[in-house]
Swiss-Prot record:
Transmembrane segments: none annotated. It catalyses: [HPr protein]-L-serine + ATP = [HPr protein]-O-phospho-L-serine + ADP + H(+); [HPr protein]-O-phospho-L-serine + phosphate + H(+) = [HPr protein]-L-serine + diphosphate. ATP binds at residues 153-160. Its EC number is 2.7.11.-, 2.7.4.-. The Walker A ATP-binding motif also binds Pi and PPi. Belongs to the HPrK/P family. This is HPr kinase/phosphorylase. Catalyzes the ATP- as well as the pyrophosphate-dependent phosphorylation of a specific serine residue in HPr, a phosphocarrier protein of the phosphoenolpyruvate-dependent sugar phosphotransferase system (PTS). HprK/P also catalyzes the pyrophosphate-producing, inorganic phosphate-dependent dephosphorylation (phosphorolysis) of seryl-phosphorylated HPr (P-Ser-HPr). Both phosphorylation and phosphorolysis are carried out by the same active site and suggest a common mechanism for both reactions. The gene is hprK. One of its GO terms (molecular function) is phosphorelay sensor kinase activity. Residues 201-210 are annotated as: Important for the catalytic mechanism of both phosphorylation and dephosphorylation. Residues 264-269 are annotated as: Important for the catalytic mechanism of dephosphorylation. The keyword Transferase applies.
Length: 310
């Protein structure tokens, strides 16, 4: 995903000090944010100009103690053509030399009243998610009881129809057909729709329907964490399926593993209700309530009791 300076400005609500239309369209290529330190003393070895440059109270205080000439020289050296933008936090007064250097070198300059640490966190969160490598997978992503569930299966097995039934039951559609998944961190997987498919469901025999138009804004969601994968497969006599729910199967996307449950599909089975139950059961397991474990413990106690009675 391409991220521009304008997108960052809109997301974190930065105030424009200096920026042309061309500078607002400049691409941000890394989520790393630099807070200049040694650079202000004139040491530029290992300086990373491709990063956003963030000035907080410490950096601003050091700058204000410099002479006007030195301040201008350092800032002009710091502002490179690869630098996407410079931001000054905490509503601090921006030195004239900084504005002059930004204009001469063609660098967008912004200010914010937000504290430095909070602003850095907001920008990093947005950039990490936006710049993360996307993997497109086939399936339907639903928000079921607040849990992101990725429904997959063979073509024509009824994934979209199941998604529609879940929407009618009060759950929310995130994406249909193509789901773009990405890792926000080492343990968190998120999914979102392709822009062209946002809020749309394709139902065989009906065509494409706009879920938001038919069922309202409460029936859709722009993105969701992906916490559970469900794979729908045709029921086959003699094929072994997990009946106790202790298979512990996982699937990995973008380096993040999530649990996967296989659900056999056959005529007359209400798949949407089964998926609801699977989502609630998974949440219960995360909270420490494992029905399978409880059953196994009861079975063990019963066997022990029967053996003692012999």
């Amino acid at each position: 995903m391409t991220v521009t300076v304008k997108m960052l400005v809109t997301k974190v609500k930065l105030d424009v000090v200096y920026a042309t239309d061309d500078l607002l369209e400049k691409e941000i290529t890394t989520s790393d944010i630099s807070r200049p330190g040694l650079e202000m003393t004139g040491y530029f070895d290992y300086y990373a100009p491709e990063r956003l440059q963030l000035f907080g109270m410490k950096e601003w205080s050091y700058l204000t103690q410099m002479t006007s000439h030195n301040r201008y020289s350092v800032l002009k050296e710091m502002f490179k053509k690869d630098t996407p933008a410079v931001i000054v936090s905490r509503g601090l007064a921006i030195p004239e030399e900084m504005v002059q250097a930004a204009q001469e070198e063609g660098i967008a300059l912004f200010s914010s009243r937000v504290s430095t640490s909070r602003l850095a966190g907001e920008m990093s969160y947005f950039l990490d998610a936006s710049l993360a490598e996307r993997t497109s997978v086939h399936g339907v992503l639903m928000d079921i009881y607040g849990m992101g569930v990725l429904i997959q299966g063979d073509s024509g097995i009824g994934k979209s129809e199941t998604g529609l039934e879940l929407v009618k039951r009060g759950h929310r559609l995130v994406a249909d057909d193509r789901v773009d998944v990405f890792a926000k961190d080492e343990e968190t997987l998120w999914g979102e729709p392709a822009e062209i498919l946002r809020h749309l469901l394709e139902i065989r025999g009906v065509g494409i329907i706009d879920v938001m138009s038919l069922y309202g804004a409460s029936a859709v969601k722009d993105s969701s964490q992906v916490q559970l994968a469900i794979y729908l497969e045709n029921f086959e006599a003699g094929k072994v399926f997990d009946r106790l729910g202790n298979g512990n199967e996982e699937i990995t996307f973008s380096g993040v593993s999530i649990p996967r449950i296989r659900i056999p599909v056959k005529t007359g089975r209400n798949v949407s209700v089964v998926i609801e139950a699977a989502a609630m059961n998974h949440r219960a397991k995360e909270m420490g309530f494992d029905a399978t474990k409880t059953f196994e413990e009861r079975l063990t106690r019963l066997i022990s009791k029967n053996e003692e009675g012999k």
